[in-house]
Amino acid sequence: MPLLNTITTPYAEAFLQVAESKKEVEKIIAQAKSILQLWDESSELREAMGSPVLEVESKKAALEKIFSGKVTPSFLNFMKLLAERQRIGFLNSVLERLLELYRAQRNIALATVTSATPLNEDQQAALLKNVQSVAGTNNLELNLKVDPDLIGGFVVRVGSKVIDASLSGQVRRMGLELAKVT
């Protein structure tokens, strides 16, 4: 088990158990996804929470101010606990591990779809059906990302399977084929 997992797994497992005991699992999972997005978008938040200079009480006060009323009390207490234990800098990794454990517990496959442009709801629904058939399961969660470097099309990753239907992927494959010919 990688070192990061030895740190994150006990916290993620304990938090999932707390969520189950309070019957807040679905709410906690939705909040975890929102906080992960905020964490990714806010370098200021990451830097402040990861700073060894900022005292624990200041970090807890900041968490209270930012998240009070926006997350369940158990989620806020969990983040404060991470701050007390000097682990708040690992919040994103703990929440990612929490989501992994949740998906594993419920046999949910994660499909990461990277497209050149944002997909509308109809495109998402059509893609979901196709990915479900490829993945062999109807229990699937889509993680949508946008990467303009793909030029057009999309790339789907489900576990170890990768479907590259992007224009940049086609150009790359064509270049490899041309290299074989010459």
UniProtKB/Swiss-Prot annotation:
Protein's name in the database: ATP synthase subunit delta
Compartmental location: Cellular thylakoid membrane
Function of the molecule: F(1)F(0) ATP synthase produces ATP from ADP in the presence of a proton or sodium gradient. F-type ATPases consist of two structural domains, F(1) containing the extramembraneous catalytic core and F(0) containing the membrane proton channel, linked together by a central stalk and a peripheral stalk. During catalysis, ATP synthesis in the catalytic domain of F(1) is coupled via a rotary mechanism of the central stalk subunits to proton translocation.
GO CC annotations, alphabetized: plasma membrane-derived thylakoid membrane; proton-transporting ATP synthase complex
Keyword Membrane: yes
Membrane topology label: Peripheral membrane protein
Coiled coil, from the record: none
Family per record: Belongs to the ATPase delta chain family.
Domain of life: Bacteria
Chief location bin: membrane
InterPro entries given in the database record: ATP_synth_OSCP/delta_N_sf, ATPase_OSCP/d_CS, ATPase_OSCP/dsu
HAMAP family, sorted: ATP_synth_delta_bact
Keywords assigned: ATP synthesis, CF(1), Hydrogen ion transport, Ion transport, Membrane, Thylakoid, Transport
GO MF term set: proton-transporting ATP synthase activity, rotational mechanism
Subunit and interaction comment: F-type ATPases have 2 components, F(1) - the catalytic core - and F(0) - the membrane proton channel. F(1) has five subunits: alpha(3), beta(3), gamma(1), delta(1), epsilon(1). CF(0) has four main subunits: a(1), b(1), b'(1) and c(10-14). The alpha and beta chains form an alternating ring which encloses part of the gamma chain. F(1) is attached to F(0) by a central stalk formed by the gamma and epsilon chains, while a peripheral stalk is formed by the delta, b and b' chains.
